[in-house]
Structure formats: C-alpha cells, structure tokens
Curated annotation (Swiss-Prot):
Organism domain of life: Viruses
This protein's name: Regulatory protein E2
Keywords: Activator, DNA replication, DNA-binding, Early protein, Host nucleus, Phosphoprotein, Repressor, Transcription, Transcription regulation
Provenance organism: Human papillomavirus type 2a
Pfam families: PPV_E2_C, PPV_E2_N
GO molecular function: DNA binding; DNA-binding transcription factor activity; nucleotide binding
Region (DNA-binding domain) location: 309-391
Length: 391
C-alpha cells in the first residue's frame, strides 16, 4: 500500500508541475495525458484491492476510474498521431487538448480559434441559441491516420467544414429548429453579419395547410374521422346519392355542413371528443361513419358545425409532466388561453396510466398564438380539436 501511495503521489506531483508550466508544446500535452492515464489505472487497482483511500486521495468507484482511464488513452493516442503530422510544431496548450475540446462538435477532432454564432429561431430573442464556429479544424483520416487542417465555415444552413471535397455538417440549423423553433425560420448572427433563412415546412401536410391556420409545432397527418351528416339526400348535394349510414335517423334531423379532417399525431388516430348536446323532442341525431376523402384539400382541421363549439387542445402524456406544464403556463391565462382543466384519465380502460389536460381558447387565433409562443415539452402530445361550450 505504501508503494502504491508513493507512486500515486509522484504521478500527481508531475501533473501539478505540468499545470504550473502551462506549456504550449504538444509533447508536454502527451505527457499530461499519459500521467492522467497512469493515475486512473492506479486508482482502479486500488479499488480492486478494496481500498477506499490512498494517502489523501479518495478512491472512486471502479467504473469511474475505468471510464477516465479509457478517455485518457483515447486522447493520448490521438495526440501521438498528431505529433507525427506537420502540425506538431504549432502551439498546443492544455486548453487546446482537453477532453471537452475533443468531445465538442465536431467530435473526435481538434479545434482552434472558436467564435460564437447566435441563432434566433423564429426571429425571437426568447428562442436563441449560441453555437461555436471554429476557425480551424484538425480532421483525422480514418484510413491513413493522417491529419488535415481545414477551415470551419458557417452559412444559413449550419456550421460545417469541407474535407476532401465533401461538406461535413456538425451543427444543422434545420434540425435544431425542430427543437427550439416553430415556424421553421431563423436568423444567424456571426461577426456582425445577419443571415436570414426561411425553411420549408416540417411535413408535407403542414406545407399545404391553409393560410388561416399557421404552422404549429405539431407534426400533422390526415386521418378519416366520423362526421355528423344529415339523413336527407339534400345534405349530399344535388345529383348525388346519400352514403349509407349507421345510425337511427328521422326526417327532422338537422343538416350539418361538410365535415373536415382532423389534426392528429403521425402514426396515431384519436377520435374527436364527444360532447353532450340537447336534442329537441321528436328529433334524433344521425351520424355517418363514412371515410372522408378529399384530395383537393389538405387543411387538417377538425370538422365541426356547432356554433357553440370552442377550440381546445388536449395534452396527452405523463401525469407529472402535465402538472408541471400546467403550472408553467398559468402566467399566460386569459392571454394565451381561457381555461385549463385538472389532470384527468379515461375510466374503465385497460390499465393505461396516460393522463390528459384540456385547455380552452376563446378563438382559433388564440390557440394558434398559444402554439406559436409556448413550446410543448417532449413526451407530451398536443391534440387540437373542438368541444361544445359548457359552463
């Protein structure tokens, strides 16, 4: 144990000397990582022997020492191959060769002369992100292990470099906009220059949506849904026969306008929440369960013919996530939404613990503003629709 403690002290003393020296020579950085590797190997062995302390040093868990030793080996080998290149005579400091620099995008490359790039998604300061564009990037050829020095570049699409005539993106603003933006637009601020970019819609159905309902952060798809229709032939238009229905009908049943398709999450179908309606005496509601197909329209909205309907959003997901989200949006009440329900579940199910929270809006415009300004957390699914207004 005493021998191990002496060796560990000598290793740590060497590390301190390298930190104080603050050299800019590559051979000193290789020596530094060799000592880090040796230190973690000794701590790993000490833990295997059941030791929790070696002198004044606490011995970490085996997995911690092993992971740090593997990282040190990886960086040391990369620096040793860099030492054999034409760039070994350049200045290399501890900061240039640290693990954080090695793992920063683009990963497994060495970088120098970084500058900040500010990207404002949707043109909003509330949705801006800062990225690092590198002046020079040192890329290793995976076949020959040789290193190549290429300039880092930035444009409206992202951060990238060109190696052997191939563009390699390490930050894609289009992909980032799916996380931080809504409308698919962003501004790139770099070195006093502003680059504007307008992106295409995320999905084809969003691209063909009508102008009166802007894009939302929800990916949409078209799905057939049941829609109320009248029993009489007049509701189907002149010259067309009424489709077969599966409901009790009467001659006094009211007519309804043509149904529209609903917005749903891709790969899932959710029926429109049923609402209770008072039907006049002697009248019976009639529903047609035909599939709705209209290739000339791609407006994925709920069909509704009730004048007393209000736009809503049903949030579906984990109960705790819903509660946190409801608490977070309370400050927007009466501005971005009118009412919000408590967390609710479907009764008599198959044991599914999925929860829901319903938000009411005074208008479709208010709901659109809500979707534009409020980001729906990951794990929650937003289901826009309509419900009958009741108190």
């Amino acid at each position: 144990m005493e021998t191990l403690a002496n060796r560990l002290d000598a290793c740590q003393e060497t590390l301190l000397e390298l930190y104080e020296k603050d050299s800019n020579k590559l051979e000193d950085q290789i020596k530094h990582w060799a000592q880090v590797r040796l230190e973690n190997v000794m701590l790993f062995k000490a833990r295997e022997c059941g030791m929790t302390r070696v002198g004044c040093t606490a011995v970490p868990a085996l997995t911690v020492s092993k992971a740090k030793a593997c990282q040190a080996i990886e960086v040391q080998l990369a620096l040793q191959t860099l030492m054999q290149s034409a760039y070994s005579t350049e200045a290399w400091t501890l900061r240039d060769t640290c693990l954080e620099m090695w793992d920063a995008p683009p990963k497994k490359c060495w970088k120098k002369k970084g500058q900040s790039v500010l990207v404002k998604f949707d043109g909003s300061s509330d949705r801006d992100m800062i990225y690092t564009s590198w002046g020079f990037i040192y890329v290793q050829d995976t076949i020959t292990d040789s290193w190549h020095k290429v300039p880092g570049q930035v444009d409206e699409l992202g951060l990238y470099y060109v190696h052997d005539g191939v563009r390699v993106n390490y930050v894609d603003f289009g992909t980032e906009s799916l996380t931080y933006g809504v409308t698919g637009t962003w501004e790139v601020h770099v070195a006093g220059t502003v680059i504007h970019h307008t992106s295409a819609s995320v999905s084809s159905t969003q691209a063909s949506a009508s102008d009166d309902e802007p894009l939302s952060p929800i990916r949409t798809a078209v799905s057939p849904v049941p829609a109320p229709v009248a029993a009489s032939a007049e509701s189907t238009g002149a010259g067309r026969a009424a489709p077969p229905t599966q409901a009790l009908c009467s001659a006094q049943a009211p007519t309804s306008p043509p149904a529209k398709r609903q917005r749903v999450i891709v790969g899932q179908q959710h029926p429109r929440p049923d609402s209770t309606r008072t039907v006049g005496e002697g009248e019976v509601e009639c529903y047609n369960k035909r599939s709705i197909s209209d290739s000339n329209r791609t407006d994925p909205r709920w069909g509704h013919g009730d004048t007393d309907s209000v736009p809503v959003i049903h949030l579906r997901g984990d109960a705790n996530c819903l509660k946190c989200f409801r608490y977070r949006v309370q400050k927007h009440k009466d501005v971005l939404y009118a009412r919000v329900s408590s967390t609710w579940h479907w009764a008599g199910g198959n044991g599914d613990k999925t929860a829901f929270v319903t938000l009411w809006y005074t208008s479709v415009e208010q709901r659109t503003e809500f979707l534009t300004r409020v980001s729906i957390p990951k794990g929650l699914i937003a289901l826009p629709g309509y419900m009958s207004a009741f108190v």
